[in-house]
């Protein structure tokens, strides 16, 4: 994604609905160029094209959440990938930064196995390069908008495995206390996966430090990185 496309996402996110002509003026490029950028962003499932304008999608959709702070999340994913070795099996919980980590591993590592409760991440891997050679999807109740499995079956499935690293996302952070979420079922799924990993690692950008979810996800002392 180009710098201009990132800027377009920021503008559309702020305004929710923006005309092509307005974007053209703001970014000082032709409307033809803007339309091409919008087509590319729609192909990535980051926004919706309508006649003459663009709108953001439902923010509970992981593809749309990925659009926020995209470049920052890419850098986080690249840094996290450095602690994963070729041939390693890891667990990856749902989240936009987690999806970008898996994409990074697909492009830079070899023979990686990913265990996840996210059908989105499983599909995301399919569209990436071949560094991730095996995907194991934990069963459970399917949450359609987040494309993630939750419920007691996630715990049952996770207990069959034990890995060195679990990568998780988060919805918010309370200083001195820990990480929070807005969904109790997803928190329970994450805790089940934490029980099957030696190290639990949070992937998040700084915007989450100003957000406070209503459900406690994990105490700070329970996170290794």
Identify the meaning behind each predicted range:
Residues 9-12, 19-23, 28, 43, ...:
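Conserved phosphate- and dinucleotide-binding cores of soluble alpha/beta proteins
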Residues 95-98, 207-209:
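Short beta->alpha connector loops
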Residues 2-17, 21, 26-27, 32-94, ...:
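HTH-adjacent hinge/linker in prokaryotic transcriptional regulators
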Residues 97, 115, 132-134:
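Conserved N-terminal glycine/acidic-rich loop preference
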Residues 57-59, 95, 138, 170-171:
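Generic beta-structure capping elements
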Residues 117-120:
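Active-site catalytic microenvironments in core metabolic enzymes, especially phosphate/sugar-handling
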Residues 78-81, 85, 99, 103, ...:
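Amphipathic, non-transmembrane alpha-helical secondary structure
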């Amino acid at each position: 994604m180009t710098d201009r496309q990132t800027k377009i996402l920021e503008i559309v996110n702020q305004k929710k609905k923006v005309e092509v002509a307005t974007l053209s003026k703001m970014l000082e490029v032709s409307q033809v160029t803007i339309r091409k950028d919008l087509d590319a962003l729609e192909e990535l499932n980051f926004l919706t094209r309508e006649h003459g304008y663009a709108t953001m999608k439902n923010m509970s959709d992981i593809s749309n959440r990925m659009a926020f702070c995209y470049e920052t999340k890419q850098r986080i994913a690249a840094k996290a990938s450095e602690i994963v070795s070729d041939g390693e099996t890891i667990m990856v919980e749902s989240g936009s930064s987690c999806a970008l980590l898996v994409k990074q591993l697909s492009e830079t590592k070899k023979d990686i196995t990913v265990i996840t409760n996210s059908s989105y991440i499983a599909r995301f891997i399919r569209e990436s390069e071949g560094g991730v050679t095996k995907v194991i999807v934990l069963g459970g109740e399917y949450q359609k908008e987040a494309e993630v499995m939750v419920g007691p079956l996630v715990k049952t499935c996770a207990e069959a495995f034990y890995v060195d690293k679990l990568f998780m996302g988060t919805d918010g952070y309370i200083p001195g206390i820990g990480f929070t979420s807005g969904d109790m079922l997803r928190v329970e799924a994450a805790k089940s996966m934490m029980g099957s990993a030696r190290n639990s690692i949070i992937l998040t950008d700084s915007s989450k430090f100003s957000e406070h979810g209503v459900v406690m996800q994990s105490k700070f002392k329970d996170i290794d990185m």
